[in-house]
């Protein structure tokens, strides 16, 4: 049997644990360790997926020398960890966003490029691995929709999102960034100018927004509308309400919801289960997250380009920065796009 890639995960909260599960279940990887600031959590995940728990990244690197590393810690504590991981020579899969702000994202990319430009580094934008969005991109690339004129992207969560994520991140950088990247990726255009308005309620205590609606001007002449919020009540029938709609001179493509057509009616109420991102059935992880991690493994294994480069991830974050500037000034804002070398 061909040698497996050794893999490890730094940060095993909700998403990091799923990274560990994906490596454990992939036939091309051997999960050799996990790290978390909460060592008891690390031990629990290690036991679940038959690997070893480490107290620090340095200890993990020294003992295991992993070839691929998922970095799933919060973006506000990621910088030094990512640099240390890059210096180890591993190929990196970073959770999105790259950093809490654009300046730190640029600095991180500069450092990673100096250290290990020849490695396969990528960022986990799961919509690129969602077959529904990939289908729309393919149709656009084939010209089936003609010239793209408008795009509408919606991503609504409940107010539980504000409670969980509000103290350390914000709606635009954690949630809207998915759709910003999806708009650019599917259409093959960049977002050049933005104008945004917001509603601030519960998130006022953390100095950011509960809801944002924005107009985006694309480099191909199209106009996009973004709607995102953490407003719906916690008992809402769907944990995530997403929509993506593209209109062109030759047709229309549309994604509605994330429940894959499944509706549940029971004594407890009505539910649209989230079945697109990371569903688990019979102990097996599937969905866009599994696809994204499997793609990263294949990129390293077969020497292919990743689904998203660090530059593209950075440019999605640059749109977030422009939206934040527009909210602050009340004016339309140009997006600071940069070209970088990604190999």
Residue ranges and their predicted role:
Residues 1-49:
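N-terminal Rossmann-like dinucleotide-binding module
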Residues 55, 93-94, 121-123, 152, ...:
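Hydrophobic residues in well-ordered beta-strands that form the structural core
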Residues 63, 67-68, 74-75, 79-125:
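Beta-strand-loop-alpha-helix segment that lines the small-molecule cofactor/substrate pocket
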Residues 99-161:
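A contiguous active-site-proximal alpha/beta segment in oxidoreductase catalytic domains
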Residues 124-131, 159-195, 207-210, 312-313:
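Mid-domain beta-loop-alpha active-site segment that forms a flexible
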Residues 180-260, 290-302, 340-343:
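Contiguous beta-strand/loop segments that form the cofactor/metal-binding neighborhood of enzyme cores
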